[in-house]
Design a protein with these regions (language model features):
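Conserved HGGG/HGGXW glycine-rich cap/lid loop of the alpha/beta-hydrolase fold
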Residues: 15-69
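Short alpha-helix in the alpha/beta-hydrolase fold that links the catalytic acid
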Residues: 47, 200, 209, 223-232
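Active-site loop/oxyanion-hole signature of alpha/beta-hydrolase fold enzymes
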Residues: 58-99, 260
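Short beta-strand/loop motif that positions the catalytic acidic residue
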Residues: 207, 213-215, 219
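Acidic catalytic loop of the alpha/beta-hydrolase fold
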Residues: 218-222, 248
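Catalytic histidine-centered segment of alpha/beta-hydrolase-like enzymes
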Residues: 246-255
Length: 270
């Protein structure tokens, strides 16, 4: 018998705004929405595969982050929040618990501030969106590409196309990978550079669902100290202990630990 967690469905869905989004699905059980971090999404991650043992994991790839094409019309944080709302509906994750990372966690919080029913609960891994000039973290775009990868994940092999080994690729494949990396970096930069502050601090009080904040202990992009800042602004927040050995994208460095937190906050039997 085929293990249901090993069967990955990839589909392309149309949003109400006229765009299309690639969605990965695996596992069986209650729906869990998963939003990727800065590296983008090329297929199921280890955390997704873990959670698929008792959830129907549904993970859309946001525009410009891999298998979903770049969308030039997304020029402001408002554009992105509207797009995420449409993507959520099209992917079938509206109202379900979510796991979101980095910039996607920021967008999820922005969405919840104006659409409370967007998700039932959120596990937010290293969310961007706040800024403290006295505790700024490392500027991802002020370091080399190699340093960028190590800032995102201790285990850079988990970053997929963004930092994969190009050996063995032919000329056309090298071009394709290079273009994809450029678009991902440009898209991510548009959301967090030069500053990640789009006024989220003034809207977090509107987030009415439970939020669990998760940080990698070695996150130098959004330092773990920001967890207290987020927790102090959210009406219903739980701050988990920082995960040792994990950088910014803790769900990639510590998939089992993050999956365990998700199960605690969104149990499959609930």
């Amino acid at each position: 018998m085929t293990d249901p967690t090993s069967v990955v469905e990839r589909r392309v869905v149309a949003t109400s705004g006229g765009g299309t989004v690639t969605v990965f699905e695996l596992g069986s059980g209650p729906i869990l929405g998963v939003l990727h971090g800065t590296a983008g999404l090329d297929g199921p991650t280890a955390a997704m595969e873990d959670l698929a043992a008792d959830h129907r994991v549904i993970a859309p790839c946001l525009p410009g982050f891999g298998s979903t094409p770049d969308e030039p019309s997304l020029r402001s944080i408002h554009d992105w929040v509207v797009a995420l709302s449409e993507i959520s509906d099209a992917a079938g994750i509206t109202g379900a618990p979510w796991l979101a990372s980095s910039i996607s966690a920021m967008l999820a919080l922005e969405l919840a501030a104006i659409r409370p029913e967007a998700f039932a609960s959120l596990v937010a891994v290293g969310p961007t969106g706040l800024w403290d000039a006295d505790d700024p973290g490392t500027d991802l775009y002020a370091v080399s590409l190699g340093e960028q990868a190590s800032l995102l994940a201790q285990n850079t092999s988990t970053l997929g196309v963004l930092a994969g080994d190009p050996d063995g690729l032919d000329g056309d494949e090298l071009i394709e990978v290079g273009v994809s990396r450029y678009i991902r970096r440009r898209t991510a930069a548009s959301l967090v550079w030069p500053l990640p502050d789009h006024g989220l601090a003034g809207r977090l009080h509107r987030v009415s669902v439970p939020v669990t904040l998760v940080w990698g202990a070695d996150d130098r992009l959004v330092p773990p100290s920001y967890g207290e800042r987020f927790a102090g602004l959210l009406p219903e927040a739980t701050l988990a202990a920082p995960i040792a050995g994990a950088a910014h994208l803790a769900e990639l460095d510590a998939p089992a630990e993050v999956a365990a937190i998700v199960r605690l906050r969104a149990p499959a039997g609930a």
